[in-house]
A protein has these predicted regions:
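Short beta-strands and strand-coil junctions in structured, solvent-facing domains, enriched
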Residues: 5-6, 142
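Hydrophobic, well-ordered secondary-structure elements that form the walls
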Residues: 32, 46, 79, 94, ...
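C-terminal beta-signal and adjacent terminal beta-strands/loops
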Residues: 97-105, 124-174
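Gram-negative outer-membrane beta-barrel transporters
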Residues: 1-4, 14, 20-106
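Structural signature of outer-membrane beta-barrel channels/translocons
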Residues: 35-43, 80-86, 123-125, 129, ...
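Flexible, surface-exposed loop regions and adjacent strand-edge segments
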Residues: 11-18, 60-66, 109-114, 148-157
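Transmembrane beta-barrel architecture of outer membranes
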Residues: 17, 27-29, 72-76, 115-119, ...
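Short, glycine/charged-rich beta-strand-loop motifs at protein surfaces that mediate ligand recognition
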Residues: 106-111, 119-123
Length: 174
């Protein structure tokens, strides 16, 4: 449970927006997480959450509306491995992530529906202090809105970057 006072939201026409007090909001929810080590070096992780986040009676403009950018639910599942080799450990990972519906505005007019992404990575623990991994996030290039606002009578949205491919390197000096 979380109670927030003096929550602030952007309001006004595009280009002249200001922060304004949106009142109080309450959030209640539950999160669950489990891990199953089904074979040596391999695990299956699963997690989920359900959240109800609304503006309270104290909010004159948004009473009873859902708080922007708070998905109603989320879930994830991944298979993770550690494969020891003479050249260091290889760490494959495959994950699916589900994000529930949420709004971008206090009026609850601009909504992003539920979407899911599939992510993968392969890490290499070359030494105790060096790790290199390659990843592909959003493998199937699922498009969804990350932000939205009203511009006059038109709704405008920013779309995610789509599939992302990258390399992470970590070196611990101490």
């Amino acid at each position: 449970y979380t109670h927030t006072k003096d929550m602030q939201l952007y309001s006004g026409p595009v280009g002249m927006q200001t922060l304004s007090n949106a009142g109080k909001a309450d959030a209640t929810g539950v999160e669950l997480e489990a891990k199953w080590r089904f074979a040596p070096g391999w695990s299956w992780d699963i997690n989920g959450n359900v959240i109800r986040s609304e503006f309270t009676n104290d909010s004159e403009l948004y009473h009873g509306n859902r708080v922007p950018f708070v998905p109603r639910y989320g879930a994830g599942s991944s298979v993770n491995g550690v494969i020891d080799t003479r050249y260091g450990a290889l760490m494959p990972r495959l994950a699916v992530n589900l994000v529930g519906p949420h709004y971008f505005d206090g009026d609850n007019q601009l909504r992003q529906g539920t979407y899911a992404t599939l992510d993968s990575s392969l890490g290499w623990q070359a030494t105790e202090r060096m790790n290199i991994s390659v990843y592909v996030d959003n493998l199937f290039d699922r498009r969804y809105r990350t932000y939205g606002y009203m511009n006059g009578s038109s709704a405008v949205a920013q779309v995610n970057m789509g599939r992302t491919v990258g390399i992470n390197t970590r070196i611990d000096f101490f």
